[in-house]
Amino acid sequence: MADLEEQLSDEEKVRIAAKFIIHAPPGEFNEVFNDVRLLLNNDNLLREGAAHAFAQYNLDQFTPVKIEGYEEQVLITEHGDLGNGKFLDPKNRVSFKFDHLRKEATDPRPYEGENAIESWRHSVENAMRAYVKEHYPNGVCTVYGKTIDGQQTIIACIESHQFQAKNFWNGRWRSEWKFTITPSTTQVVGILKIQVHYYEDGNVQLVSHKDIQDSLTVSNEVQTAKEFIKIVEAAENEYQTAISENYQTMSDTTFKALRRQLPVTRTKIDWNKILSYKIGKEMQNA
């Protein structure tokens, strides 16, 4: 092990550490970071070399954060990244600094977004927040309005998690939805992601995703938002139902097939008569 450590350059050590951090299960960033810190045994190298991994993890996981002075949380996503460690809270129209290691928001300042699309963004946000409140008890959503390649685009992100470390499991739901504001009809594109880690007497992870495409009729802001939420609700309900059904099927078939119902002898042992068996006598005489 010592020989291997001598062969690895600092760059290679940081690259390996960054991979561990980026792939940390939901709710277990600190545990993975502390383990990597012990292995690397060089705090300055870890902080400087793996800073991009801290940021990538939060962006990928849609990490929710609360800004002091504001009631609701906002998600850390690539769509709100303003550069130089600053992010956008489109609901409250503020920018803020985000510490990717401590996961803290500071220095909120007024920020003017794209006013031309704000009425659309606001309508979708109101509808999306009502939907998330109904379906995700711990859910957070952030809705952006941006011009991408000359097209006015709405992007809605949802995050919901349950961290149950004392029960040896953690899980997170993420979904991202986009559509452009074009006359008559437009295409809705979504991606749904589930990640769950169970680690009592074992180590099992569920990592699943599904891509969605559908068409949306574009009329006024409020009606379009309602129709958009119908698409979101139908797709997410269908996905969650399919996941549950697959697990039930696996429980009834696949997992049972992994274990013999009878020993190789095809005969069950009567433990009450164990002493009458040869093995029982051998154990008794041992």
UniProtKB/Swiss-Prot annotation:
<keyword id="KW-0007">Acetylation</keyword>
<feature type="modified residue" description="N-acetylalanine">
    <location>
        <position position="2"/>
    </location>
</feature>
<dbReference type="Pfam" id="PF01267">
    <property type="entry name" value="F-actin_cap_A"/>
</dbReference>
<dbReference type="GO" id="GO:0030036">
    <property type="term" value="P:actin cytoskeleton organization"/>
</dbReference>
<dbReference type="GO" id="GO:0051016">
    <property type="term" value="P:barbed-end actin filament capping"/>
</dbReference>
<dbReference type="GO" id="GO:0030863">
    <property type="term" value="C:cortical cytoskeleton"/>
</dbReference>
<keyword id="KW-0117">Actin capping</keyword>
<feature type="modified residue" description="Phosphoserine">
    <location>
        <position position="9"/>
    </location>
</feature>
<dbReference type="InterPro" id="IPR042276">
    <property type="entry name" value="CapZ_alpha/beta_2"/>
</dbReference>
<protein>
    <recommendedName>
        <fullName>F-actin-capping protein subunit alpha-2</fullName>
    </recommendedName>
</protein>
<comment type="subunit">
    <text>Component of the F-actin capping complex, composed of a heterodimer of an alpha and a beta subunit. Component of the WASH complex, composed of F-actin-capping protein subunit alpha (CAPZA1, CAPZA2 or CAPZA3), F-actin-capping protein subunit beta (CAPZB), WASHC1, WASHC2, WASHC3, WASHC4 and WASHC5. Interacts with RCSD1/CAPZIP. Directly interacts with CRACD; this interaction decreases binding to actin.</text>
</comment>
<comment type="similarity">
    <text>Belongs to the F-actin-capping protein alpha subunit family.</text>
</comment>
<comment type="function">
    <text>F-actin-capping proteins bind in a Ca(2+)-independent manner to the fast growing ends of actin filaments (barbed end) thereby blocking the exchange of subunits at these ends. Unlike other capping proteins (such as gelsolin and severin), these proteins do not sever actin filaments.</text>
</comment>
<dbReference type="InterPro" id="IPR042489">
    <property type="entry name" value="CapZ_alpha_1"/>
</dbReference>
<dbReference type="InterPro" id="IPR002189">
    <property type="entry name" value="CapZ_alpha"/>
</dbReference>
<dbReference type="GO" id="GO:0008290">
    <property type="term" value="C:F-actin capping protein complex"/>
</dbReference>
<dbReference type="InterPro" id="IPR037282">
    <property type="entry name" value="CapZ_alpha/beta"/>
</dbReference>
<keyword id="KW-0009">Actin-binding</keyword>
<keyword id="KW-0597">Phosphoprotein</keyword>
<dbReference type="InterPro" id="IPR017865">
    <property type="entry name" value="F-actin_cap_asu_CS"/>
</dbReference>
<dbReference type="GO" id="GO:0051015">
    <property type="term" value="F:actin filament binding"/>
</dbReference>
